[in-house]
């Protein structure tokens, strides 16, 4: 029996909840993975997994064995890297998940420079706005915007981007400018679709906080589409500066109600809460943290 392979398949079976998913990762068949699990259970003399037609769950013994198996795989990976002299030479695949707009607009250049620096590393970038399960989906690093973070991940604050109300000068010439937050209801407000707060907008100015109702007929589920719509004169929007700083600098957009702003948007770097993290992933985390700190539209990471 290939013990290391069996342990790896068992660990991923617990994490993915599916032998078929493990087979796809291992580029083999589901019956092959089933045989590996059966052989491992015979070797140990205990049942590790409870199988049904709809689910796969570890038994109590399987849950305890899972933690030990993780440690064994960690030690094995470290020993192999040391034996091959690769402890200082990153190599292998890094799977990265990021919000679609941030990944498309800002992340590509950062990853390209990392690949140029480390020619033995491969990166798979998954752009998706949903909250992915890092372990189940085999993600090494995830970038998450906002304050909601998964409890089972290690989070590192990479930056904070202020959020300002902005509009194109052409729109403001046509419609005028709101003089106070409550007047936003009289203007075309472009917002992100599916927000929990709906048309409610929370703004602050120093110690003052106002909750205002906005009106708008256009809602978009992609930040770059909001950026384009605002630049085209479609209305007023509340945007993080990483998304629009260049347009503000060029004059394509201007601030509206400049004394007021929204809650700053935090950007975190996440990694699975396992003890072992490959060198390639650690280096990319550090690289991304440095690059994000230099992006236009990010400010002191402690201001949140």
Regions found by a protein language model. Give the residues of each.
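Conserved amphipathic alpha-helical core elements
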Residues: 22, 40-41, 253
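Flexible hinge/capping segments at coil-to-helix
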Residues: 152-163, 167-192
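Short helix-loop hinge/linker segments at domain boundaries
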Residues: 53-56, 63, 74-97
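Central regulatory/effector-binding core of bacterial HTH transcription factors
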Residues: 91-154, 301-304
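N-terminal short secondary-structure element
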Residues: 1-27, 65
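Hydrophobic hinge/microswitch elements
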Residues: 211-255, 262-264, 273, 282
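A short LG(V/I)-centered, amphipathic sequence patch enriched
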Residues: 41-58
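C-terminal effector-binding regulatory domain of bacterial HTH transcription factors
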Residues: 67, 120, 241-250, 260-304
